[in-house]
Every structure is written in C-alpha cells, then in structure tokens.
Amino acid sequence: MGRPYREAIEGLIGVSNSVVFSHGKESGPWGSKITAMAEVARDLKFEVLSVDYRGIDDPQTRVHKLIETLSAPGTSNLYTAPVLVGSSMGGYVSAAAAATLWPRALFLLAPAFYMPGFEQYTPQDVPAPTTIVHGWHDDIVPVENSVRWAREHRATLHVLDSNHRLEDQIPTVCALLREWLKSLP
C-alpha cells in the first residue's frame, strides 16, 4: 500500500489489535475455518469478533451490517483500524467496507470478486494492504478472479491445491494467517 495510507494508519491514536471475521454466504460466524483462524489470532493476543450474517443474502446489506457493527457506540476504541478477514462473500464484504472502516489490513479467502452480473460491485478503492488465499480448484469463484484483483491492486496472492472452501488446507491457511498477522506494523 502507498505511503499516504501507512502514514494515516500510523497517525491514528489507539489503533486496535483486533481481527474481525466475515463468513461466506453458506457458512456461519463460527465455522471450522473461522474457529481455527480465531485461535491463531487469539494466540497472538488479538481481540476477535465474528459478525453473524446468517439470513442476510444481499451482499450490500452485509457490508452495511459490518460497518454498523464496528461503528456502534462503545466499539470505536476496540475496532479502530481493525484487521478484516473474510471468506467468499465475506471477502467481498470486508473489501467493500474497507473504504469506510480504514482497516489495518485485509486477509481474504476466495473473495467473491468479479462475479457474473455483479462485476461492477467488485471493490476497487481498498485502502489497505491485502493478502488473498484461493484454491486452484474453486468451482464457485474462479481463481482467475483473485489473480486479476491481486494484479490490479498489487495484493499478495497464495494459491493452494484446494477448492472454494479450502477445508483441506485449514492448517496451511492458519500458518499463512499467523505469519501475516505477525508481520503487520
């Protein structure tokens, strides 16, 4: 990410040490991936929140829920410049909310970018360093979508021998998350 973003984040007083998870459309706030990644974050002394989007199918409504959750009275100090982690639609939600929330960084799993009929909604103004993890055999969100977004936004991209859910790669995803969280400024 560019110098102005880094200076803006470093200038914040009380930047939180929190990780906020956003699950995918067919999942829940404490599925196996989020549960495993939350353990990693807690082990590194991060506060953890997983937003519950069950029953909300509209991606934009989910974006508004994330923004409202992190902007609610009493949460401002805890969630100043949080780390956003999202899977599939949750990856889209995290990236779309980034322009409002100014996160410290994003870690996205198979984010739902450039989906047919929704290409125009793919987030373009993401003001934070971003890492993407995607499966080569994803039959829901083509891996090419993440390659394209990563190239256009200079994001870090890890492509694993897995499918959309990455369930057979949870230990690898957690290892990537651990090293990534440890590297954050």
Language model features by range: what are they?
Residues 126-127, 132-134, 138:
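Short beta-strand/loop motif that positions the catalytic acidic residue
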Residues 30, 139-145:
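Conserved alpha/beta-hydrolase "acid-adjacent" motif
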